[in-house]
């Protein structure tokens, strides 16, 4: 991982406010795609709603390269820093 990506991952924890649910899902999916690659995990069970949302968000990025996901993650964190500010 690039130092820029690692800094973005650290910065997101220092936002003044917690991003909304959709933003958190996007952050999660981009982070997983950038660090792991395509989702190859089993789909969560019917009662695990949070797990299913996270799994689906990551699954939607299937085929995106780790590099592209990392770049998109960095850009998205920059948007969130502008929107929410830093602590």
From Swiss-Prot:
Main location: cytoplasm
Record carries keyword Transcription regulation: no
Annotated GO biological process: fatty acid metabolic process; very long-chain fatty acid biosynthetic process
Residues the record lists as binding an acyl-CoA: 13, 28-32, 50, 54, 73
Keyword vocabulary terms for this entry: Cytoplasm, Lipid-binding, Nucleus, Transport
Annotated ACB domain residues: 1-86
Subcellular location as annotated: Cytoplasm; Nucleus
Gene Ontology molecular function: any one: long-chain fatty acyl-CoA binding
Gene Ontology cellular component terms for the protein in this record: cytosol; nucleus
InterPro entries, A to Z: Acyl-CoA-binding_protein, Acyl-CoA-binding_sf, FERM/acyl-CoA-bd_prot_sf
Role according to the record: Binds medium- and long-chain acyl-CoA esters with very high affinity and may function as an intracellular carrier of acyl-CoA esters. May enhance the activity of the ceramide synthase complex.
Family, similarity comment: Belongs to the ACBP family.
PANTHER family xref list: ACYL-COA BINDING PROTEIN 1, ISOFORM A (PTHR23310:SF62), ACYL-COA-BINDING PROTEIN, ACBP (PTHR23310)
Name the record gives this protein: Putative acyl-CoA-binding protein
Source organism: Schizosaccharomyces pombe (strain 972 / ATCC 24843) (Fission yeast)
